């Protein structure tokens, strides 16, 4: 019934198995990949014919985590998986980025890659396995895929690279880097680092590339056993048409790509395109060509002209040389009621970034396969259509926005203060108000400034820069601070963020083979120069975190109570803590280890809440004097509330110095009195005294008398 083929290798000290022919046999390609006890199923289906009216590769990638993989049932009312989580979206993009450039030019058939996590062993993150399985399924599917690719995660622990560190090892690593590529070339890098230098980062990339070679060979071995015949894609030679169109509009197109202002440049390019379309599609005549074909050739010519100009003259679209960063204006405190804000403008790219400080109530609970955890740092990136002068639908967060937000998050996360030192929940929102390339890196710069404006003590200011590369044979040009057009028309774009000490985040996307380690080294060195320049420009606005929090930011005080007192502070059904919050106006969070966080924008509110909590969680001190309130009058004495929720008895004999006939002669309910804690009786009841305390001054009369007697005896 089954025609099963499999390959198994030892990879990083754990078995990696790739199997096909047993599950999902109606898909064009299906591979079950197992690493340790983590198992994923990757499937590929490609439509039989090209999609009409598209001039791009219609590829979709969906990575799906099933909770049964970790032996759990989903939360929520419906008890089933819902919309994609942030991690599912990020891993889907992680798979898409290295495989997309490897499809043969001209492939227009809808292609869908679905990766499902079937089992998670809590040691091996499924994302690397998902990349490997996707590559294998594509290689088997018959789709025109110029793979296979391999992938690996690289850690850096105790000054050594670690291949595919386990989830436990990731706690101690200074680096979390994912690298993917073919046997000959690196295609994609995604990373977060703790201020590591360029040599360590590049070394990690090459380490990962070397160590996923066995995976590439294993996929080739599996393909030799089970791959379908590759589908043919008709390759059309457009050289004659290119030459013809170039002769028609070359001067106009070259002139257009010398206009520095984006909107003016687009208008000039649009006129050149109209001229081409009018030439090939005259009114009233039968067209000789398909419109998409002519538009595609025109697009190719745009790329070639920009590339020729840069390589031949050293000048870019806006007149800069390859190393110059656009003009930068950085401002802080631009919004009066925000806790922290910054407006970062670099050329025609602008980000309005706002920081909000919250409390433990604002932490985000994240439900993942490896368990539920709380996230105290959130960074959200929004890219409205007006930022590029267009109209568009406003709706849910798009994949690109999630990806760019996470890239900026990775850049800032390593420089945040430890949560126990700065116990706030931080939310940073980057609103892209203008965009012409590098908006994610503008978000990094703006986030750093907005956090410091809010008084968050970052280790060091952080900046980001987007770089590009153009390669033609032996000639290449590395471009600093790329424009949007340079991003689309280049062979490599990579984004580097970090401090003056080192890199905190690196993302690379390489579209062609032939980019060597030496070229990458040059590019990273140039990126460092650009980053240091940007940090200098940012320092004109703010060099360090403000000494005080913003006027409207909450203040948080942290202290500890004994864990066996937590129940008393919370009370039955939360009654006590609710009363504290309602009457003081402060927010209170208590962790399982007894850490108490009290937050409010009003200092007196915090003091009142802390005093209340400590009165419950602490024990009263023997012989100490307390302010109290009479809560009940009895024949034998009065009960006084004197220490938080604690009551004690003032016996009738302890009410006043003389003989007291009736308790009500001295006190009544609601009276404010001063009492001294005498001790506890045999049943543990609290004994108090009023007569040994001066009810006006609160002075201890008993101690005063003893002191006087001692002085007399000394005489």
UniProtKB/Swiss-Prot annotation:
Involved in mRNA degradation. Catalyzes the phosphorolysis of single-stranded polyribonucleotides processively in the 3'- to 5'-direction. InterPro entries: ExoRNase_PH_dom1, ExoRNase_PH_dom2, ExoRNase_PH_dom2_sf, KH_dom, KH_dom_type_1, KH_dom_type_1_sf, NA-bd_OB-fold, PNPase. It comes from Rhodopseudomonas palustris (strain BisB18). GO terms for biological process: mRNA catabolic process; RNA processing. Residues 696-715 are annotated as: Disordered. The keyword Glycoprotein does not apply. One of its GO terms (cellular component) is cytosol. HAMAP family: PNPase (MF_01595). It is found in: Cytoplasm. Gene3D superfamilies: GHMP Kinase, N-terminal domain (3.30.230.70), K Homology domain, type 1 (3.30.1370.10), Nucleic acid-binding proteins (2.40.50.140). It is an enzyme of class 2 (transferase). Residues 623-691 form the S1 motif domain. Keywords: Cytoplasm, Magnesium, Metal-binding, Nucleotidyltransferase, RNA-binding, Transferase. This is Polyribonucleotide nucleotidyltransferase. Mg(2+) binds at residues 487, 493.
């Amino acid at each position: 019934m089954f025609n099963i083929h499999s390959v198994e290798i030892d990879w990083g000290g754990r078995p990696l198995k790739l199997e096909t022919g047993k599950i999902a046999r109606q898909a064009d390609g299906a591979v079950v990949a197992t690493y340790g006890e983590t198992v994923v199923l990757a499937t590929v289906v490609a439509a039989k014919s090209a999609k009409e009216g598209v001039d791009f590769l219609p590829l979709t990638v969906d990575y799906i985590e099933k909770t049964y993989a970790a032996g759990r049932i989903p939360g929520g009312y419906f008890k089933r998986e819902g919309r994609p989580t942030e991690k599912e979206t990020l891993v889907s993009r992680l798979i898409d980025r290295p495989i997309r450039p490897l499809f043969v030019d001209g492939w227009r058939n809808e292609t869908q890659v679905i990766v499902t996590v079937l089992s998670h062993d809590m040691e091996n993150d499924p994302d690397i396995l998902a990349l490997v399985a996707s590559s294998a399924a594509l290689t088997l599917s018959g789709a025109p895929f110029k793979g296979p690719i391999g992938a690996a995660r690289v850690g850096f622990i105790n000054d050594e690279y670690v291949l595919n560190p386990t989830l436990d090892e990731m706690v101690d690593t200074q680096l979390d880097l994912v690298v993917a590529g073919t046997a000959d070339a690196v295609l994609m890098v995604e990373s977060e680092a703790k201020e590591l230098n360029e040599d360590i980062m590049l070394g990690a990339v090459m380490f990962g590339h070397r160590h996923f070679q066995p995976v590439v060979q294993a996929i080739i071995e599996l393909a030799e056993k089970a791959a379908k015949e590759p589908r043919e894609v008709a390759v059309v030679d457009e050289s004659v048409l290119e030459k013809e169109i170039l002769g028609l509009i070359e001067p106009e197109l070259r002139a257009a790509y010398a206009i520095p202002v984006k909107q003016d440049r687009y208008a000039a390019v649009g006129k050149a395109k109209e001229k081409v379309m009018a030439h090939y599609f005259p009114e009233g005549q039968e067209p000789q060509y398909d419109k998409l074909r002519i538009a595609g050739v025109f697009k190719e010519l745009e790329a070639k002209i920009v590339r020729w100009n840069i390589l031949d003259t050293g000048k870019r679209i806006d007149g800069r040389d390859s190393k110059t960063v656009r003009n930068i204006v950085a401002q802080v405190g631009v919004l009066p009621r925000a806790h922290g804000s910054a407006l970062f403008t670099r050329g025609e790219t602008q980000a309005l970034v706002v920081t909000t400080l919250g409390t433990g109530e604002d932490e985000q609970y994240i439900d993942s396969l490896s368990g539920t955890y709380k996230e105290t740092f959130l960074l959200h990136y929004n890219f409205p259509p007006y930022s590029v002068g267009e109209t568009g639908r406003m709706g849910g967060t798009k994949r690109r926005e999630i990806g760019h937000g996470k890239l900026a998050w990775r850049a800032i996360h390593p420089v945040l203060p430890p949560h126990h030192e700065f116990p706030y929940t931080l939310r940073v929102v980057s609103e892209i108000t203008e965009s012409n390339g590098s908006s994610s890196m503008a978000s990094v710069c703006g986030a750093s400034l907005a956090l410091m404006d809010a008084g968050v003590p970052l280790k060091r200011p952080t900046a980001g820069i987007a770089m590009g590369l153009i390669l033609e044979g032996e000639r290449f040009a590395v471009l600093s601070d790329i424009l949007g057009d340079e991003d689309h028309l280049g062979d490599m774009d990579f984004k580097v963020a970090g401090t003056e000490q080192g890199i905190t985040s690196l993302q690379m996307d390489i579209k062609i083979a032939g980019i060597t380690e030496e070229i990458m080294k040059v590019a990273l060195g140039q990126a460092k120069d650009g980053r240091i320049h940007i940090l200098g420009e940012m320092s004109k606005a703010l060099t360090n975190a403000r000494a005080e929090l913003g006027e409207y930011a909450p203040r948080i005080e942290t202290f500890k109570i004994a864990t066996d007192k937590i129940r008393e502070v919370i009370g039955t059904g939360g009654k006590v803590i609710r009363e504290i919050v309602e009457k003081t106006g402060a927010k209170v969070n208590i962790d399982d280890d007894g850490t108490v966080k009290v937050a409010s924008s009003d200092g007196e509110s915090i003091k009142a809440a802390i005093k209340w909590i400590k009165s419950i969680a602490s024990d009263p001190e023997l012989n100490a004097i307390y302010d109290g309130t009479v809560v009940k009058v009895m024949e034998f004495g009065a009960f006084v509330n004197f220490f938080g929720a604690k009551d004690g008895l003032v016996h009738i004999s302890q009410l006043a110095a003389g003989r007291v006939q009736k308790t009500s002669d001295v006190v009544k309910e609601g009276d404010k009195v001063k009492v001294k804690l005498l001790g506890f009786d045999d049943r543990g009841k609290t004994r108090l005294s009023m007569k040994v305390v001066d009810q006006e001054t609160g002075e201890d009369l008993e101690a005063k008398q003893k002191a006087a007697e001692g002085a007399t005896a000394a005489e």
